[in-house]
Amino acid sequence: MRTEYCGQLRLSHVGQQVTLCGWVNRRRDLGSLIFIDMRDREGIVQVFFDPDRADALKLASELRNEFCIQVTGTVRARDEKNINRDMATGEIEVLASSLTIINRADVLPLDSNHVNTEEARLKYRYLDLRRPEMAQRLKTRAKITSLVRRFMDDHGFLDIETPMLTKATPEGARDYLVPSRVHKGKFYALPQSPQLFKQLLMMSGFDRYYQIVKCFRDEDLRADRQPEFTQIDVETSFMTAPQVREVMEALVRHLWLEVKGVDLGDFPVMTFAEAERRYGSDKPDLRNPMELTDVADLLKSVEFAVFAGPANDPKGRVAALRVPGGASLTRKQIDEYGNFVKIYGAKGLAYIKVNERAKGLEGINSPVAKFLNAEIIEAILERTGAQDGDMIFFGADNKKIVADAMGALRLKVGKDLGLTDESKWAPLWVIDFPMFEDDGEGGLTAMHHPFTSPKDMTAAELKAAPENAVANAYDMVINGYEVGGGSVRIHNGDMQQTVFGILGINEEEQREKFGFLLDALKYGTPPHAGLAFGLDRLTMLLTGTDNIRDVIAFPKTTAAACLMTEAPSFANPTALAELSIQVVKKAENN
C-alpha cells in the first residue's frame, strides 16, 4: 500500500512519485490549497492539494485530525523561504495527485495540543502512542533490545527461555499466583525473576546465558515501578565479579554510544559504605557535587543534646552538607527543607549561614551558634570547605535516618539550586553491600536475595557472625538510578543451607521450597555469577523521560490497573468453580 515512510522523505526523493500511508496530524485549509501534515511511525511530511487535482482537493476538504489515509503524489523541493528547519522533512513536500480515506476518526478524546492527564493518556493509549515522542521512545526501546541481543551473541551468550509458570520462592515481594485447574488447590507463581532457573542453567553447563524476560512483582508501586517489568537477565560460569562487571559495563557503554553518541568512559567503583558515608545513598547521583561530611568528633562535648547525643552514640551520626551559594536561601526555603527531611525520620534541620567567614561568629547566622564556640564552628567550616555565601545543613540522629534524610536533601537542594549538572552522565559501580539487614523484628533479611554469596567467608564464619558478612554483590548506578544489580552466587550446598538458616528458614521449609536447588548443588556445581538490568529503566534514561510508563507500550497505573482494558476484572463464576476458587468478600466496617 505504500512505497515510502512519511518521515524518511528527503531531497534525494525530489521528482519521484510516492505512495504514503498514515494519519492526518494537522490540516490547514487556504481555500484554493489544502495543506496537511501527514504522520507515520517515522515522522511527519507536508502534503498539499491544489486545484489542478480537483477530485483530490475536494476529498481533502473532508479531512480531520487522525483520519487514516493513503496519498499518492510527487515529491517537490520547497522554496527557500518555505523550508522548515525544525522538521527532518522540512526541505521537501508532496504534491498529492490522489487521496484515499481509509478510515475516518471520531472526535478525539485526547487534546491535540498534548495537554492531557496521564489517566486520559492511559485510557486511550492507542491514540497516545501515535504521538511522535511516544513512538520515538518505543523505537529506541526496540533499538536497545536489538543492540543487546547482538552484543550478547557476539560475546558467546546463549538466549535461553525459562518458565513463566513456576513455584513461589521468597524474593522480597509478593508473588502473582496462578491457580491450577488440573491440580486442585495448587498454584503456580509468575516469576519475580528467573533467578533459580538461570543458576540451574549454569549447573547444566551452558556457561553464558541471557534473556530479555518479563518479571512480575505484586508490590506497592512507585513512579518508577510496574507490576510487570522487563529484565535483561544474565548469568555466567567461571567468571569473577570483576570479570562480570567488565562485560556488563562494556554492554552499557555500547548502548550509550550507539543510542546517544556518548562515551561513558570507565565506571568508577565505590563500596556501599563509602557511598552511604559520602552521599547518604547506595545509588548516588554523582552529577551533584555536594557530599556529606562527618563532624561528630567535633561535637561530642557541646552542651547541645541534639548534636552531642548522636555524636557520642556508636549507632549515631552527625553529618554536615555544604551548599555552595546556599546562604541566599530564605527563611521560608529553609523551613521547607526542614519539613522535607522530617519525611525521612529526621526531627529537624540545623544550619549555619556563612556570610563572611573571616569575621568568625559575627560572620555567620545560625540558630545553633549559641551552643557552639568559635573554635568548633571554625573547625566545621574548615572541614567542610565552607566559603563566604555558603550554607551548611546538619543531620544528627541514628546512622540510617541521617543517611536517608541528608541523602534526599542533597538531591533536592542540588536540583532546586541548579547544582546538579543535568547535561552529564555519571555511572558507577557500588560493591561490597552488607549481606544481611535488620528486618525490624529481631531477625535478619537478605539485602539482595538468599542466593548471594558472602565475600571471603566460610559457612562456619558466616554462621558465627552474619552481621559482619559482606555480600559479593554489585549494583550499576547511572545518574542516581540503579539500572542493574547482581552478585556471585552460592555454589556450595552447606553455604546455601547456612544462609537459609540465618534467614530463619528451617530445614523442612528449605526442602519444601528449595529442594530442587539443594539437590542440584550436590552434583558438581560451577562457580557462577550474574546480573539483571531493568530494561524499562535503561530505556527511561536513554530517552530522557522521568516516567517509566513513557517507555512501556501498555503500562499499568500506580494502582496496578490497566485503564484501557479495565484489567484486573472479575472472573467468570464458572471459571472460578472449575478452579475450585471461591471469592470471599470482606465484611464492611460498621
From Swiss-Prot:
Pfam families recorded for this chain? Answer: GAD, tRNA-synt_2, tRNA_anti-codon
SUPFAM superfamilies, per the entry: Class II aaRS and biotin synthetases (SSF55681), GAD domain-like (SSF55261), Nucleic acid-binding proteins (SSF50249)
What is a biological process (GO) this protein takes part in? aspartyl-tRNA aminoacylation
PROSITE patterns found in the cross-reference section: AA_TRNA_LIGASE_II
Task: Please list the GO terms describing molecular function.
Answer: aspartate-tRNA ligase activity; ATP binding; nucleic acid binding
Q: Which residues bind L-aspartate?
A: 171, 217, 448, 489
Chain positions recorded as ATP binding sites: 217-219, 226, 482, 534-537
Gene Ontology CC, one term: cytoplasm
The EC number(s) this enzyme carries:
6.1.1.12
Q: Any idea what job this protein has?
A: Catalyzes the attachment of L-aspartate to tRNA(Asp) in a two-step reaction: L-aspartate is first activated by ATP to form Asp-AMP and then transferred to the acceptor end of tRNA(Asp).
The entry's family comment says: Belongs to the class-II aminoacyl-tRNA synthetase family. Type 1 subfamily.
- Which protein is depicted? Aspartate--tRNA ligase
This protein's species is Escherichia coli O1:K1 / APEC
Identify the taxonomic lineage of the organism of origin.
Answer: Bacteria, Pseudomonadati, Pseudomonadota, Gammaproteobacteria, Enterobacterales
* Gene it is expressed from: aspS
